[in-house]
Swiss-Prot record:
Residue ranges flagged as DNA-binding region: 203-262
Extent of Low complexity compositional bias: 141-151
Location within or outside the cell: Nucleus
Entry GO MF terms: DNA binding; DNA-binding transcription factor activity, RNA polymerase II-specific; sequence-specific double-stranded DNA binding
Record keywords, A-Z: Developmental protein, DNA-binding, Homeobox, Nucleus, Transcription, Transcription regulation
Function statement: Transcription factor that binds 5'-CNAATTAG-3' DNA sequence and regulates the expression of numerous genes including genes important for brain development. During telencephalic development, causes ventralization of pallial progenitors and, depending on the developmental stage, specifies different neuronal fates. At early stages, necessary and sufficient to correctly specify the ventral lateral ganglionic eminence (LGE) and its major derivatives, the striatal projection neurons. At later stages, may specify LGE progenitors toward dorsal LGE fates, including olfactory bulb interneurons.
GO biological process, one term: generation of neurons
Source lineage: Eukaryota, Metazoa, Chordata, Craniata, Vertebrata
Name of the protein in its database record: GS homeobox 2
Organism from which the protein derives: Mus musculus (Mouse)
Bridged cysteine pairs (disulfide): none
Length: 305
């Protein structure tokens, strides 16, 4: 028996025998098959429906073997993620109309965009666990535009998978992050809360509480010399158990205070001179009034002489 006669008998038997009823599926979108689609992909999609293959038995007819080889072999241009995902969605003996590929593609987009942004592991978990599901679908008559729809959806899924293929481990910005002591962002974050505000260095400097002995020695040194050399400043700081910076700042403040006191004293002296002059002027006016001729005439008139 020749091979062509065996194939013809299978085709005649297939056309005479009514096709088994298959569960109804949701119709996919109607698109036209593009003319530039690769031939292995078209053969794997539009392969002949063998009765023994539909019933689940093992079939060794040439058409079934050829379609199986084309479906199991990856496409020649599979590179990156787009063509590989399209081959996994369409080939492999598990494509059915629009229902065999769409559930698989929807499973890849199951996490929300926010979840994919802050927790990329969720999308990877769905991506790795869902693809084995497409091997359990049964063969159905291929609709005219289901291959193009599956290819377009597979390309979109591949683009999303490529975008999520490199997860950014520092994506959750709002998570609890710990900065180093030298990082200026640490102070910004600490200023937002109220627990660590005591550790934030503010612009105010703590006042040094000098003892009476220290103040006495500093005043004595200032009365003898208002400006200190560095060696003398170090000696005083060591003797009084202070830092060199504390002694320097104290002398600076003391000089400012001394200048203010000098200005205040000069002002007081100037005002006191004015007061004395005004009092003398008033006295002279009073004497002149008492010695005026009118007053003398009055005295003369009152006098009995």
């Amino acid at each position: 028996m020749s091979r062509s006669f065996y194939v013809d008998s299978l085709i005649i038997k297939d056309s005479s025998r009514p096709a088994p009823s298959l569960p109804e599926s949701h119709p996919g979108p109607d698109f036209f098959i593009p003319l530039g689609m690769p031939s292995p992909l078209v053969m794997s999609v539009s392969g002949p429906g063998c009765p023994s293959r539909k019933s689940g038995a093992f079939c060794v007819c040439p058409l079934c073997v050829t379609s199986h080889l084309h479906s199991s072999r990856p496409p020649a241009g599979a590179g990156g993620g787009a063509t590989g995902t399209a081959g996994a969605a369409v080939a492999g003996g598990g494509v059915a109309g629009g229902t065999g590929a769409l559930p698989l593609l929807k499973s890849q987009f199951s996490p929300a965009p926010g979840d994919a942004q802050f927790c990329p592991r969720v999308s990877h978990a769905h991506h790795h666990h869902h693809p084995p599901q497409h091997h359990h679908h049964h063969h159905q008559p291929q609709q005219p535009g289901s291959a193009a729809a599956a290819a377009a959806a597979a390309a979109a899924a591949a683009a999303a998978a490529a975008a999520l293929g490199h997860p950014q481990h520092h994506a959750p910005v709002c998570a609890a992050t710990t900065y180093n002591m030298s990082d200026p962002r640490r102070f910004h974050c600490l200023s937002m809360g109220g627990s660590d505000t005591s550790q934030v260095p503010n612009g105010k400097r703590m006042r040094t509480a000098f003892t009476s002995t220290q103040l006495l020695e500093l005043e004595r040194e200032f009365s003898s010399n208002m400006y200190l050399s560095r060696l003398r400043r170090i000696e005083i700081a060591t003797y009084l158990n202070l830092s060199e910076k504390q002694v320097k700042i104290w002398f600076q403040n003391r000089r400012v205070k001394h200048k203010k006191e000098g200005k205040g004293a000069s002002r007081n002296n100037h005002t006191s001179c004015k007061c004395v002059g005004s009092q003398a002027h008033y006295a002279r006016s009073e004497d002149e009034d008492s010695l005026s001729p009118a007053s003398a005439n009055e005295d003369k008139e009152i006098s009995p002489l």
